[in-house]
């Protein structure tokens, strides 16, 4: 069968793109290397609790169009993200706000908080920050940095803050109100019944094959590629490049490809590896415990605690079950075969990515999108917006 598009990746980007194209009567097929839909927003029910398998995901946006779009595929509750930071035996509200400052210094007014922070910054005398530590100190002063920034950041990146470049932290929001809402967006919530249903509904009517990689699925291209061994029956080592349709090993053809995997992996890392940070999750079902920590997300900011946060999933949907599920989240170095979570957008990686973009431009009928395809961290609303924008561009191109 001939398809208009092969979408590689059934995460939010690929699913939203596929939905839009299917809605406009384009023939689309989707594949994913995982055994489930929804990518990193995948949720699974455990004892009546929707567990966020790849870390906490809270949907938030100020874009009414995107909010209306996601509400076509799920009903959202009114969850407000209000994480708590734990430093030793002290608890602090996030983001940094008057509740944080009052707990830290015993002050009550915004004027007192501003004065305290200004005094600490002035005492340090940092005018041109040379690393992340100096940058953070120049923004929030020593107390907030030492208790709430330093250890957490070093665990996230696996390096001392003095070894990290200053540009990683452009600003640290300070709010001088008693408001624990982490986000400032107009719309916010969690889909009742979890995120997986969104991908399922986005892909309704679209043929999907799970548990298969792009390399194992694709046979090759037709024109301009046979001489390089990229036609039907091509070797596993020669899938990229050339023009014309892509063929699957099952005999289907695809006029164009949307690839949402790692852009460097697509090109067999021919220019070198882009770097990522990975994560490891340790999940625990606690029978007979109806409430473990009283909040969905608690960050652990001291360096000595190996995990960065504990997620208690039932609080995302205000659960009342007699048991609870918690997940400890451990940052990890990334190497091939690991899940890539966060792109490391430093100077070296940004330059390398631009070189891969040049290679991608020569891929006549291949589009690259999403967090891995564009080597960029996206919030969920931006993922959807970018996917729909790409779909609209494709529809205009074919008009």
PLM region descriptions:
Residues 5-30:
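N-terminal Rossmann-like FAD-binding beta1-loop-alpha1 element of flavoenzymes
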Residues 11-13, 35-36, 99, 154, ...:
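Short, solvent-exposed loop/turn segments at secondary-structure junctions
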Residues 22-44:
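Glycine-rich FAD pyrophosphate-binding loop
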Residues 38-39, 49-54, 215-219, 245-304:
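Central helical "cap/lid" subdomain
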Residues 47-123:
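Dinucleotide-binding Rossmann-like beta1-alpha1 core, especially the glycine-rich loop
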Residues 88-92, 99-221, 245-254:
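Active-site/ligand-binding neighborhood in enzyme catalytic cores
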Residues 219-250:
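Intrinsically disordered, low-complexity terminal tails and inter-domain linkers enriched
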Residues 265-398:
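C-terminal segments that line or cap access tunnels to active or ligand-binding sites in enzymes
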């Amino acid at each position: 069968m001939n398809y208009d598009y092969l979408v590689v990746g059934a995460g939010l980007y690929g699913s939203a793109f596929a939905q839009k194209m299917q809605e406009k009567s384009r023939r689309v097929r989707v594949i994913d290397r995982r055994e489930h839909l929804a990518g990193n927003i995948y949720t699974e029910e455990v004892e009546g609790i929707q567990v966020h398998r790849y870390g906490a995901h809270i949907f938030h946006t100020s874009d009414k169009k995107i909010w209306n779009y996601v509400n076509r595929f799920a009903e959202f509750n009114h969850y407000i993200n209000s994480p708590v930071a734990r430093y030793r035996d002290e608890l602090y509200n996030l983001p940094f706000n008057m509740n944080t400052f009052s707990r830290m210094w015993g002050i009550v007014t915004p004027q007192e908080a501003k004065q305290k922070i200004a005094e600490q910054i002035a005492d340090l005398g940092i005018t041109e920050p040379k690393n992340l530590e100096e940058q953070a100190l120049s923004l929030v002063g020593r107390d907030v940095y030492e208790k709430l920034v330093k250890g957490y950041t070093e665990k996230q990146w696996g390096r001392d803050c003095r070894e990290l470049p200053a540009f990683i932290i452009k600003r640290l929001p300070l709010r001088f109100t008693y408001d624990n809402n982490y986000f400032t967006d107009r719309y916010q919530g969690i889909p009742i019944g979890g995120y997986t249903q969104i991908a399922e509904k986005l892909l309704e009517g679209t043929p999907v094959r799970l548990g298969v990689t792009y390399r194992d699925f694709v046979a090759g291209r037709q024109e301009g590629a046979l001489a390089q061994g990229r036609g039907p029956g091509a070797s596993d080592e020669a899938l990229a490049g050339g023009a014309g349709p892509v063929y699957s090993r099952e005999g289907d053809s695809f006029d164009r490809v949307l690839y949402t995997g790692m852009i460097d992996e697509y090109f067999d890392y021919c220019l070198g590896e882009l770097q990522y940070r990975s994560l490891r999750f340790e999940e625990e079902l606690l029978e007979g415990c109806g409430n473990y920590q009283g909040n969905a997300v608690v960050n652990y900011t001291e360096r000595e605690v190996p995990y960065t946060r504990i997620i208690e999933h039932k609080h995302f949907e205000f659960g009342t079950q007699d048991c609870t599920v918690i997940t400890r989240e451990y940052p990890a170095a990334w190497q091939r075969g690991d899940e890539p979570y966060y792109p490391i957008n430093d100077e070296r990686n940004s330059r390398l990515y631009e070189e891969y973009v040049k290679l991608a431009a020569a891929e006549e009928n291949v589009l690259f999108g999403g967090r891995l395809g564009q080597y960029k961290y996206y919030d969920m609303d931006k993922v959807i917006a970018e996917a729909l924008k790409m779909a609209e561009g494709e529809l205009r191109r074919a008009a």
